[in-house]
Amino acid sequence: MNSLDLPKPPHETRVVVAMSGGVDSSVVAGLLKREGYDVVGVTLQLYDHGAATHRKGACCAGRDIHDARAVAETLGIPHYVLDYEDRFRESVIDRFAESYLSGETPIPCVECNRSVKFRDLLGMARDLGAEALATGHYVASRAQPEGGRALYRALDPARDQSYFLYATTPEQLAFLRFPLGERPKDETRALARELGLAVADKADSQDICFVPQGGYADVIAKLRPEAARPGEIVDLDGRRLGEHEGIIHYTVGQRRGLKLSVGEPLYVVRLEPETARVVVGPRAALATRRIRLTDLNWLGSRAPDGLADLPVAVRVRSTREPRPARLSWNAAEACLEVELVVPEDGVSPGQACVIYADDGPRAQVLGGGTIRRIGALQAGAAEAA
């Protein structure tokens, strides 16, 4: 087997590298080229939203396509640019806006990986005669004794991107390779300099690439003008405390920007899109123990519909470490339920709940799903649909 766990020698193995124009994917292309693989670079043009294409840290547009092409020329590999703007708008941006209108807090990166990068790009790689698609993500995949590949957290915990890749299917994992999963970020930049890549010191991309200056509400309002529907801010008992200019400006757990003159700190507990109400309460009202998941992607060896009180670890936000939990299958609702051992604050519908075999630094990813329903501890913060 070669370094990618493929049977042919590198010079007989074609690998397509998804090149975003950043340092990580550029280093992947450079490393594989140096090892003798037949490397083909592919860059997706996903959007071109004016200010977003020029801001520092944006990705997948204008300047980044130029950088990816320049790296390919430096390495002496063929490079193709594929126009996926329409697909990206339909699969990612429009869904992002609809999710916010529904009172959720979506993660467009998960949908982009699931609906665009790892579906369409993977198919394109096969059309080009490749035996693998390599990316610059910080996540690890390893061959399993029983066959197939499993997904694991990256060596560098500060860069681990497994939270955003939980929706990768077993079939996709078999074709994907993540050469940086076993490397720290500092080593990646050093390799970029060693390879003579002009992007060695380029800033890392932002999570939401199509949102200029972090103003996601402006993007949503432009796509869906009805999103700026004003409404009331109420407490847990329904008492009116103030007004707002649209629920798209709020997310569960938010404290800043409420503009309320009350004696105690208040947080957004839930959003009610039907009534356009923002419900606020004390921090204790955010404590969540039970989570119900939909759009489940399961990577574990045991079928999810047979699970009962399985000990695992879960992440309910990308910035948090995995926490102990237990999984059970709800046969009546045909969905997976998560019970957190220690209640968590700020659990929001629309976010991902990613499931790991344990809370270790190199834990296996068992799967995950979209948080659709939460069970809060506070009496006044009853289950929100």
UniProtKB/Swiss-Prot annotation:
<dbReference type="GO" id="GO:0000049">
    <property type="term" value="F:tRNA binding"/>
</dbReference>
<dbReference type="GO" id="GO:0005524">
    <property type="term" value="F:ATP binding"/>
</dbReference>
<feature type="binding site">
    <location>
        <position position="136"/>
    </location>
    <ligand>
        <name>ATP</name>
    </ligand>
</feature>
<dbReference type="Pfam" id="PF20258">
    <property type="entry name" value="tRNA_Me_trans_C"/>
</dbReference>
<dbReference type="InterPro" id="IPR046885">
    <property type="entry name" value="MnmA-like_C"/>
</dbReference>
<feature type="site" description="Interaction with tRNA">
    <location>
        <position position="137"/>
    </location>
</feature>
<feature type="active site" description="Cysteine persulfide intermediate">
    <location>
        <position position="209"/>
    </location>
</feature>
<dbReference type="GO" id="GO:0005737">
    <property type="term" value="C:cytoplasm"/>
</dbReference>
<keyword id="KW-0963">Cytoplasm</keyword>
<feature type="region of interest" description="Interaction with tRNA">
    <location>
        <begin position="159"/>
        <end position="161"/>
    </location>
</feature>
<keyword id="KW-0819">tRNA processing</keyword>
<comment type="similarity">
    <text>Belongs to the MnmA/TRMU family.</text>
</comment>
<dbReference type="InterPro" id="IPR004506">
    <property type="entry name" value="MnmA-like"/>
</dbReference>
<protein>
    <recommendedName>
        <fullName>tRNA-specific 2-thiouridylase MnmA</fullName>
        <ecNumber>2.8.1.13</ecNumber>
    </recommendedName>
</protein>
<dbReference type="InterPro" id="IPR046884">
    <property type="entry name" value="MnmA-like_central"/>
</dbReference>
<dbReference type="Pfam" id="PF20259">
    <property type="entry name" value="tRNA_Me_trans_M"/>
</dbReference>
<keyword id="KW-0808">Transferase</keyword>
<comment type="function">
    <text>Catalyzes the 2-thiolation of uridine at the wobble position (U34) of tRNA, leading to the formation of s(2)U34.</text>
</comment>
<feature type="binding site">
    <location>
        <begin position="18"/>
        <end position="25"/>
    </location>
    <ligand>
        <name>ATP</name>
    </ligand>
</feature>
<keyword id="KW-0820">tRNA-binding</keyword>
<keyword id="KW-0694">RNA-binding</keyword>
<keyword id="KW-0547">Nucleotide-binding</keyword>
<feature type="disulfide bond" description="Alternate">
    <location>
        <begin position="112"/>
        <end position="209"/>
    </location>
</feature>
<feature type="binding site">
    <location>
        <position position="44"/>
    </location>
    <ligand>
        <name>ATP</name>
    </ligand>
</feature>
<keyword id="KW-1015">Disulfide bond</keyword>
<dbReference type="InterPro" id="IPR014729">
    <property type="entry name" value="Rossmann-like_a/b/a_fold"/>
</dbReference>
<feature type="active site" description="Nucleophile">
    <location>
        <position position="112"/>
    </location>
</feature>
<dbReference type="GO" id="GO:0103016">
    <property type="term" value="F:tRNA-uridine 2-sulfurtransferase activity"/>
</dbReference>
<dbReference type="InterPro" id="IPR023382">
    <property type="entry name" value="MnmA-like_central_sf"/>
</dbReference>
<dbReference type="Pfam" id="PF03054">
    <property type="entry name" value="tRNA_Me_trans"/>
</dbReference>
<dbReference type="GO" id="GO:0002143">
    <property type="term" value="P:tRNA wobble position uridine thiolation"/>
</dbReference>
<keyword id="KW-0067">ATP-binding</keyword>
<feature type="site" description="Interaction with tRNA">
    <location>
        <position position="351"/>
    </location>
</feature>
